[in-house]
Every structure is written in structure tokens, then in C-alpha cells.
Amino acid sequence: QCWIEAPFHCDYGTQITIGDHFFANYDCIFLDVAPIVIGNHVFLGPRVSLYTAGHPLTAQIRNLELEFGKPITIGDSVWIGGDTTVLPGVTIGPETVVAAGSVVTKDLPGGVIAAGNPCRVLRSLSEEDRAFWLAQREAYLQGST
């Protein structure tokens, strides 16, 4: 199951691999000049941008219209908040939460909460986090019956 809200933009579409139970909210952009690999149970907020493309820093070379591509990999069960940009070559580990508005310039390990520009790890997800959200789920289910 894969759900992508319109509008959505990608360069080619042939370099994108998406796992099961994927959701991308409105206005996502995937610049896929290099592979983008997305795991299972991944959620993207509105206006998340995945940029595999980059350009040389020096104007003389950039003016030759050269670009490069580096892959992006997003692990299973990752949630990326809205208005986040993921730059070329980044890997985001499984079960990580990236806060809205972040700019991810470097790899993030699994099981953490990360935020900022540049994005950095704030803390690891804990057993207390898991217990809290399991209790919230139970309360929700009891209230909806």
C-alpha cells in the first residue's frame, strides 16, 4: 500500500524504490538523479524534499552545467515532519523521527528524534516513549468503541 497526495514531483521516477505502507503528504519533491530507497511504514509530512542532486561549489565548473547525484536511504518506520529537506548522500536509520522544518545534511542513526538546520540528534527514543504511545493507542481504541 502506497499513498502519495498530489501535487507530487519527481525528476524521473525510475530511481525511486518505496516499501509497503508508505504515505507522502502534499507537495513532496523527489529529485531522483540517484537512487532514493524508502523502507516500510514511512510517513512524510507536507512539502518534504528529497534531493539526490547537487552542483559543484565553484562557479566556473557549475557553469558547465555539471551536476552530481548521491543516493538517499530512509529506513523502516521513519517519520519525517513537514517542510524538511534531505540532502544528497543521507541515510536515515529505522524508527527515527525527524522534526518539521529540518535540513538533514548528514546520516542519522536509528531510533532517535532529530531536528534543526542543520539537523542533529536530540535524543534516543526510549522505553518511556513507547509505553506512553501504547497507552495513548489504548485510550484511543477504548474511546472509539
Predicted segment positions?
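Flexible, glycine/small-residue-enriched loop-and-beta-strand segment within the central core
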Residues: A6-I18, F23-T91, N117, R123-L134
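Extracellular beta-strand-rich, repetitive "passenger/adhesive" scaffolds
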Residues: C2-I4
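Conserved catalytic segment of ABC-fold P-loop ATPases
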Residues: G93-T96, P109-G111
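Acidic/histidine-enriched, glycine/proline-rich intrinsically disordered or flexible terminal extensions
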Residues: R130-T145
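Short-chain dehydrogenase/reductase
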Residues: W79, V97, V103, I113-A115
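Short arginine-rich
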Residues: K106-G111, L141
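HATPase_c (GHKL) ATP-binding subdomain of two-component histidine kinases
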Residues: K106, A115, V121
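Hydrophobic/aromatic residue at the end of a short beta strand that borders the catalytic acidic motif
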Residues: I92, V104
